[in-house]
Amino acid sequence: MGLLQDGKWVDKWYDTKSTGGKFVRTVTQFRNWITPDGQVGPTGTGGFKAESGRYHLYISLACPWASRTLMMRKLKDLEDHISLSVVHPLMLENGWTFEDGPGVIKDSLFNSDYLYQVYLKADPTYSGRVTVPVLWDKKTNTIVSNESAEIMRMFNTAFNDITGNQDDYYPADLQAEINAMNDFVYPNINNGVYKAGFSTNQAVYEKEVKNLFAALDKLEEHLVDKDYLVGNQLTEADLRLFTTLVRFDPVYFGHFKCNIKSLVDYPNLWDYTKRIYNHAGIAETVDFNHIKQHYYGSHKTINPTGIVPVGPDLDWTL
């Protein structure tokens, strides 16, 4: 765990002393957009035209933020058009690495040992956390984006004319509802598990974990007569929630002390999570070994021994 400071790697955990024990997530810095014609997107600069073979995605199978871009790459038939690297599950003194291991796909562009070296190729003076996902442009040799929510949106539409896949996970008639759901899920659940798990103050932890479960209670009620969060189809809102729920019992329940209830104690949420897991293409993007190895093995301030639990033994069949 660490970050870059003026282009120099520093092994440094999150600073919670200055925030009263609270975990505060930093804002991603690369915010350009791939568009069908290369015109500028909602943020950043233009020049990133959707082209087959031009872009490369760096992800971690353990990371929920990266995994949602991997799912969108799969669902939108982009695997033959956007190449892929997968980091090692352990993130220790050198951050994310490309060390050999099951499921690791080396850096085919630069043969990097560490992901921070990729960041430095885009900006030799970069300061900030080195996170996944990273969407790289081979033509201009820079990072297009390291913001997972925006990469999902790019994958959803920018390459439609290339792939012929017109499936829409952010349809116009549902966008307002999807945005509202995302605005609820992100702070309370996606980031909520981290705000509980990375807190270093008892009162802060208790506040955050109670807020998390209050949000889960609301979604349990919301799903009483629904298959999906919004409308009658799979949308980006489901993908964004799923990557947290699928990790809940394997890591967040124990490692992050989010243990008021397990996910299987929520019948509607558990059925919902299994439904998404069994959607065509989703299960193959989930690697429970990477997930458990990363959290239990990387966060030495939380789990100093690095022991990875054997369980839980969950049945993902519908």
Task: Put a short name on every predicted segment.
Residues 1-318:
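C-terminal alpha-helical interaction module
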